Design a protein with these regions (language model features):
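A glycine-/small-polar-enriched, mobile loop at the entrance of the PLP active site in fold-type I
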Residues: 3-54
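Conserved active-site segment immediately N-terminal to the catalytic lysine
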Residues: 169, 183-194, 203
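PLP-dependent aminotransferase-like
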Residues: 77-144
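PLP-dependent enzyme catalytic core of the Aspartate aminotransferase-like
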Residues: 2-4, 317, 330-360
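Active-site phosphate-binding strand-loop segment of PLP-dependent enzymes
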Residues: 10, 109, 120-176
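Conserved PLP-binding catalytic core of the aspartate aminotransferase-like
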Residues: 284-315
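Active-site C-terminal subdomain of aminotransferase-like
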Residues: 15, 193-275, 289, 358-360
């Protein structure tokens, strides 16, 4: 069977060359006589893998020396608790609610202190990013929290909020490495890798060193303390070894393809193909305010739930898969992450044109 065009929101498409490399090394990783899946995480061979992965990520993102890179487990959702446990010194934090994942993080933080919702776009089904230029930031807030790209609703912060001097914490799961980033604008950014970097099971955090302290909330488990992982080079316990290995290959793939500047240009080109069609279509409509559109996740609808279902079924039969929208919103969603080739987006648009002609 030939490979499909996979528009899944995550786990998601990976670069074919990375999959081919991993397949070639599956039985014997570089003369070790074993797979990385079988390798001791304490071996020299694996230490080289994780060291190279960190070095390449630092190069890609321009991570300053005073920031730590942590490879952890538990996915982004575990960080909803870990962030307040580690950073909520005054037991106050401000959250900007632009979708389900920011809302879940905010709700989790309420278990540990005063979590204030200082802005929200819930009034219009999270179809836009609120004005964050002059927010009522709490005087004693430990941090301001955002989900930078909203996977479900297809919105993206084009400008970071004015945090009035407070540290910014960002969940970047679905826009990780999609464009250049100024790490110094964040106290911490983190993301699950299963959308834009690798297989499920790894979460990467980039966090400024002064935020990594022993002074965490009482009862914070050892495994949720950032200092545990920082002091042990992400090797306190057995890490998600194979997942990190694949992430490392994706980092090299990005470097070999011009880095994040080139990736951003390619992503803009891909997204324009789909958004231009949606803007001209008489059947399909995008659901997001134009200025806030994500380059990674593109939700759209026909306005008829039965027709939406018919489209998703027909697309699947044509080898264009995982277009069904998130269960909480319905409709369709095309996730066009770094590894989605522009040919896949063009094939999707061609299919949408055909479907529109047949279903007017």
């Amino acid at each position: 069977m030939s490979r499909v065009y996979n528009f899944s929101a995550g786990p998601a498409v990976l670069p074919e060359s990375v999959l081919q490399e991993a397949a070639a090394e599956m039985m014997d990783y570089r003369g070790t006589g074993m797979s990385v899946m079988e390798m001791s995480h304490r071996s020299k061979a694996y230490q080289t893998i994780i060291d190279e992965a960190e070095a390449d990520l630092r190069t890609l993102m321009g991570v300053p020396e005073n920031y730590k890179v942590l490879f952890m487990q538990g996915g982004a959702s575990q960080q909803f608790a870990a962030v307040p446990m580690n950073l909520m010194k005054n037991k106050v934090a401000d959250y900007i609610i632009t979708g389900q994942w920011a809302k879940k993080a905010w709700q989790e933080a309420q278990m540990y202190g005063q979590a204030n919702a200082v802005a929200s776009s819930a009034d219009k089904t999270f179809s836009y990013i609120p004005d964050c230029s002059d927010l009522p930031i709490s005087e004693n807030a430990d941090y301001v929290y955002i989900c930078e790209n909203n996977t479900i609703y297809g919105t993206k912060f084009k400008e970071l909020p004015n945090t009035k001097g407070k540290d910014l914490v960002a969940d970047v799961s679905s826009c990780f490495l999609s464009e250049p980033v100024d790490v110094t604008k964040y106290g911490m950014l983190y993301g699950g890798v299963q959308k834009n970097i690798g297989p499920a099971g790894v979460v990467i955090a980039v966090i400024r060193e002064d935020l990594i302290t022993e002074d965490v909330l009482p009862g914070t488990p050892t495994m949720l303390r950032y200092k545990t992982h920082a002091d042990n080079g992400s090797m306190y316990n057995t890490p998600p070894a194979y997942g990190i290995y694949i992430c490392g290959k994706v980092f090299k793939w990005l470097l070999n393809n011009g880095g994040l500047e080139e990736m951003k240009a390619y992503n803009e080109k891909k997204a324009a193909v789909l958004y231009d069609f949606l803007d001209a279509s008489e059947l399909f409509q995008g659901t997001v305010v134009k200025k806030d559109r994500s380059l990674m996740n593109v939700p759209f609808v026909t306005g008829n739930a039965d027709l939406d279902a018919k489209f998703v079924k027909a697309a699947t039969e044509a080898g264009i898969v995982n277009l069904k929208g998130h269960r909480s919103v319905g409709g369709m969603r095309a996730s066009i992450y770094n590894a989605m080739p522009i040919e896949g987006v063009e094939k999707l648009v061609q299919f949408m044109e055909k479907f529109e002609k047949e279903n007017r």
